[in-house]
Amino acid sequence: MAQAQRELTKMKSKHTIMEKLWGNEIWFANNEMYCGKLITIEPGEISSKGNFHYHEIKDETFFVVQGILLLDIADETGGYERVTLFENDSYRLMPGFKHRFSAGSEVPCKFVEASTTHREDDSYRCYYDKEKEEWIYV
């Protein structure tokens, strides 16, 4: 039994806190199979400085723990559909969809992201230039 307990202790993982302008992300898992984050967006804040981002590989599901999450999903013309998620709501976002987040209430929005592995080379930031009528990738 003591050996089994020692083996379980080895499986305990550390987390990393990533401070952002809009809140923070607590990464509690990111390995070759999956990623887990607890994300907090402060009231009145929007992710990525208001820009959108997307992933070509990463498949994400969001689960709201506290507050209201406003998930904006962009279309090719620069418009977007806003999905409002309340506590205990979840939403799957498949690869390729441009998106951003904001808090929709006076309290911080906390939500869990469960996804395939997070890779920095699979995060693309962009915004829509209305004059050029095209997406600009930054």
What are the functions of these language-model segments?
Residues 75-96:
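Short acidic-glycine-tyrosine-enriched beta hairpin
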